[in-house]
């Protein structure tokens, strides 16, 4: 069996801290972006459309019960929606499991951000998979943001490229997630470990808006 058979793409949907810019008592990701889909569901559908084998939502611990109730524990692979030629379509559907992770208590108020949520979900997904089988260990991670500008149905048209790629990122007007745009991207296990080391070595424990410098007096510890 070749190594390609063991490729495992895990979707990650990071949520921010539980306060809301709209003064809601729940995460802003629950806001509808269409009549039937909210922002979190849109991000999950994008992961499913990209061909993820499982999806991990990283959120504040207090939000997990509401997420489980509203989001559920699985999503259908949309590529099977239009297979009307199947004799029994209901038997050929693929269900992608949805799991939930949360930041450790010591990280709350210090590292609970989109970036750390991605790292945390990546490590939790890897640890759980490794405890089951080495063949389930994810080799790549697909990150989708709830407030992304990406059309969540679009990735299914690029599955071949996604499956064969290592690192990959969406661009818009020449910008990517590296420009602080909420655009989806794929990173590897090596990137995950490197990002974790970088946070531990260079993290300050401070919150700072992207446009502010280190010497700005307006930024402070949470």
List the predicted regions and their residue ranges.
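Acidic-enriched, low-complexity/disordered segments with a strong bias for Aspartate over Glutamate
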Residues: 5, 27-28, 53, 60-62, ...
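Conserved alpha/beta core of the MobA/IspD/sugar-nucleotide pyrophosphorylase nucleotidyltransferase superfamily
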Residues: 3-8, 188, 194-222
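N-terminal glycine-rich phosphate-binding loop and ensuing alpha1 helix
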Residues: 2-87
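Short, flexible, glycine/charge-rich loop motifs used to bind or transfer phosphoryl groups or to couple energy/partner
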Residues: 1-2, 132
């Amino acid at each position: 069996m070749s190594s390609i058979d063991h490729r495992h793409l895990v979707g990650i949907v990071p949520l921010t801290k539980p306060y809301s810019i709209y003064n809601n008592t729940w995460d802003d990701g629950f806001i509808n972006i269409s009549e039937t889909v909210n922002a979190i569901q849109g991000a999950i559908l994008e992961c499913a459309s990209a061909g993820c084998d499982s999806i991990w939502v990283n959120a504040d611990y207090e939000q997990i019960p509401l997420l489980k109730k509203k989001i559920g524990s699985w999503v259908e692979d949309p590529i099977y929606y239009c297979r009307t030629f199947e004799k029994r379509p209901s038997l050929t559907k693929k269900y992608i499991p949805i799991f939930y992770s949360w930041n450790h208590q010591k990280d709350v108020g210090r590292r609970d951000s989109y970036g750390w949520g991605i790292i945390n979900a990546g490590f939790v997904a890897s640890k759980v998979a490794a405890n089951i089988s080495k063949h389930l260990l994810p080799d790549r991670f697909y990150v989708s943001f709830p407030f992304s500008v990406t059309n969540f149905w679009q990735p299914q048209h690029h599955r071949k490229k996604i499956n064969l790629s290592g690192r990959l990122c969406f661009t818009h007007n020449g910008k990517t997630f590296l420009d602080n745009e909420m655009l989806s991207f794929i990173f590897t296990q090596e990137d995950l470990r490197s990002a974790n080391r970088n946070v531990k070595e260079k993290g300050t424990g401070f919150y700072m808006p992207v446009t502010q410098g280190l010497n700005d007096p307006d930024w402070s510890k949470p």
